[in-house]
């Protein structure tokens, strides 16, 4: 990611709004074409200038940024246009969705607003030429370039979601389990509801099934409330009042550990105590608003509601929770001055907060992304809070099935009596499943089966060996077959004169200067075949090196001369005269490429 980070740094003063947060992902360094890589290194160097730089240097910097934006915009246009002079807006949005990004993504607001304005004001019928397209995407060019170059955490998102959809359909046929009946409002839930949404740490989204129907978080709010309390109060203070160990008992037991505090924040007693710690100096309304604002930020400001009917139902039928509250009060488990009834009220309110699978998946992705919301880039929770929360979800999140779930699935998760399961794949994605029928342990029957099938197909289990787990798929990597064919595909496109394919490759994970076993580049092949349009694209759009030598010491110009392609000879001679690559730059480029190759091997 060094080159992209350099670009983001260079563009920050130009008003780029597509910042992204997340923990690092190995082997995701873009292999830009020679010219683009050269511009990026210039931008990175100029980004390190001191505040006392002279005005001409700033002008050069602005010019370099403008050229860099223009080049990336052109490459993006060529990739989507596939040889056409204008792009229909619907074609762009379709290609965008294939990467996993949604047109409603907050990070793409500027781009989508500009395209909407173009449609309203232009008579072109929703068609974008190169200049207009570049203007529309310029504010979000970094994010879009990452998306179309497949530099997100899941590169082949369509293939991955195809597998997810097949698992979803398999699990849909399950009919076991019963809807929770001890809370009257929950008893009215439709047992046929079945939905799954996912959101990656890069903001790639996918939903299947009933994913827009609101449901109450219930116990899924427990890890979120705990994370908020750790972020605001710190680990040491919170764990004076609640433990960290699985209880081995039912989640609603009147039981404390040897220290006289609730076993963990995932059982009712622990969740009630954690609720009592939040904003102790505020009234009930202020406490609820405080937590709701946090939850909204975690969900990227997507759907968040409140079911007053469920809240009233909880209060009317919550005798067990009242008993737990009085038990905690008698054992002096609350901080001094805490109103036990106010703590219970807040607990009931938080359990009655509504989300959809879609907004819930963003909350899970915020946990997967170290506390940074992937679709807004806002830092919501501290890294310490996320680490603690995921640890407890892993050991205590699935009621009495927690040990079995940790064994078979090996991922942090939290279930709820509403039929929801919040699942986190750290550093990769978050998921929210909804299916009201519960098994005998109180977990969603379809939800747990889906999680097990997901981990049996993909190497997401905490202890799957990423290097040697040959029987499982790793969606974080491009397929070995694809990587092995990149050189063949590139050179065949150059051989056959397929400029459209080369345009697509320019924004894929492909270096346009890579060589075959004879050290021949695409420019060598195009020059030998006399494909003038291919040569133009490689030297004008990709700025490839015309001095690359094959195993016989020939450069592309030599091949054009040998096969008497006079137009290509003239074009390459003019390009060689204008192409300058100093020894220092060449050494730096070679060192950077060597380092990238080394990192990809580690």
UniProtKB/Swiss-Prot annotation:
UniProt record, GO biological process: amino acid metabolic process; glutamate biosynthetic process; glutamine catabolic process; reactive oxygen species metabolic process; regulation of apoptotic process
Basic and acidic residues compositional bias, start-end: 49-64
Annotated substrate binding sites: 219, 268, 314, 321, 347, 399, 417
A molecular function (GO) term: glutaminase activity
Expression sites (tissue/organ): Highly expressed in liver. Expressed in brain and pancreas. Not observed in heart, placenta, lung, skeletal muscle and kidney. Expression is significantly reduced in hepatocellular carcinomas.
Keywords attached to this entry: Acetylation, ANK repeat, Hydrolase, Mitochondrion, Repeat, Transit peptide
Family membership: Belongs to the glutaminase family.
Function noted in UniProt: Plays an important role in the regulation of glutamine catabolism. Promotes mitochondrial respiration and increases ATP generation in cells by catalyzing the synthesis of glutamate and alpha-ketoglutarate. Increases cellular anti-oxidant function via NADH and glutathione production. May play a role in preventing tumor proliferation.
UniProt protein name: Glutaminase liver isoform, mitochondrial
Native species: Homo sapiens
């Amino acid at each position: 990611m060094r080159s992209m980070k350099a670009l983001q740094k260079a563009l920050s003063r130009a008003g780029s709004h597509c910042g992204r947060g997340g923990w690092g992902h190995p082997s995701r360094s873009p292999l830009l074409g020679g010219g683009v890589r050269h511009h990026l290194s210039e931008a990175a160097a100029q980004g390190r200038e001191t505040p006392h730089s002279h005005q001409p240097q700033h002008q050069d910097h602005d010019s370099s940024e403008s050229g860099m934006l223009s080049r990336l915009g052109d490459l993006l246009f060529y990739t989507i246009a596939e040889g056409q002079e204008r792009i229909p807006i619907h074609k762009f949005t379709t290609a965008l969705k294939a990467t996993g990004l949604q047109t409603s993504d907050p990070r793409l607001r500027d781009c989508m607003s500009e395209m909407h304005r173009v449609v309203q004001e232009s008579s072109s019928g929703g068609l974008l030429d190169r200049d207009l397209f570049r203007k529309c995407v310029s504010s979000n060019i970094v994010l879009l370039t990452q998306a179309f170059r497949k530099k997100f955490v899941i590169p082949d998102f369509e293939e991955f979601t195809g597998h997810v959809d097949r698992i979803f359909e398999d699990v849909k046929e399950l009919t076991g389990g019963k809807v929770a009946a001890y809370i009257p409002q929950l008893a009215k839930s439709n047992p046929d509801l079945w939905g799954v949404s996912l959101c990656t740490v890069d903001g790639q989204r996918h939903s299947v099934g009933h994913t827009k129907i609101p449901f109450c978080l219930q116990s899924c709010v427990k890890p979120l409330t705990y994370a908020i309390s750790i972020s605001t109060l710190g680990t040491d203070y919170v764990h004076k009042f609640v433990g960290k160990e699985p209880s081995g008992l039912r989640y609603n037991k009147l039981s404390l550990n040897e220290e006289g505090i609730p076993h963990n924040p995932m059982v009712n007693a622990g969740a009630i105590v954690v609720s009592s710690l939040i904003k102790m100096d505020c009234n009930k309304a202020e406490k609820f608003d405080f937590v709701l604002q946090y939850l909204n930020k975690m969900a990227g400001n997507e759907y968040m509601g409140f079911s007053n009917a469920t809240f009233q139902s909880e209060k009317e039928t919550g005798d067990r929770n009242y008993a737990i509250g009085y038990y905690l009060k008698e054992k002096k488990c609350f901080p001094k001055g805490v109103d036990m009834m106010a703590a219970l009220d807040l607990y009931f309110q938080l359990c009655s907060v509504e989300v959809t699978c879609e907004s819930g998946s963003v909350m899970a992705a915020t946990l997967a992304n170290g506390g940074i919301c992937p679709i807004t880039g806002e830092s919501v929770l501290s890294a310490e809070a996320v680490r603690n929360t995921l640890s407890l979800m892993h050991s205590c999140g699935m009621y009495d099935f927690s040990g079995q779930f940790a064994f078979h699935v090996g991922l942090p998760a939290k279930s709820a009596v509403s039929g929801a399961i919040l699942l986190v794949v750290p550093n990769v994605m978050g998921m929210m499943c909804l299916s009201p029928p519960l098994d005998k342990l109180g977990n969603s029957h379809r939800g747990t089966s889906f999680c097990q099938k997901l981990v049996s197909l993909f190497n997401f289990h905490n202890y799957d060996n990423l290097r040697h787990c040959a029987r499982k798929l790793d969606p974080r990597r491009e397929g070995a077959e694809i990587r092995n064919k990149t050189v063949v595909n590139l050179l065949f496109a150059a051989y056959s004169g397929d400029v459209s394919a080369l345009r697509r490759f320019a924004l894929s994970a492909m270096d346009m200067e890579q060589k075959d076993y004879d050290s021949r580049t695409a420019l060598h092949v195009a020059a030998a075949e006399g494909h003038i349009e291919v040569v133009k694209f490689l030297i004008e759009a990709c700025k490839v090196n015309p001095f690359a030598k094959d195993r016989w010491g020939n450069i592309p110009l030599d091949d054009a001369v040998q096969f008497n392609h006079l137009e290509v000879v003239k074009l390459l001679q003019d390009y060689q005269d204008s192409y300058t690559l100093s020894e220092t730059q060449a050494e730096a480029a070679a060192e950077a490429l060597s380092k990238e190759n080394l990192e990809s091997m580690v």
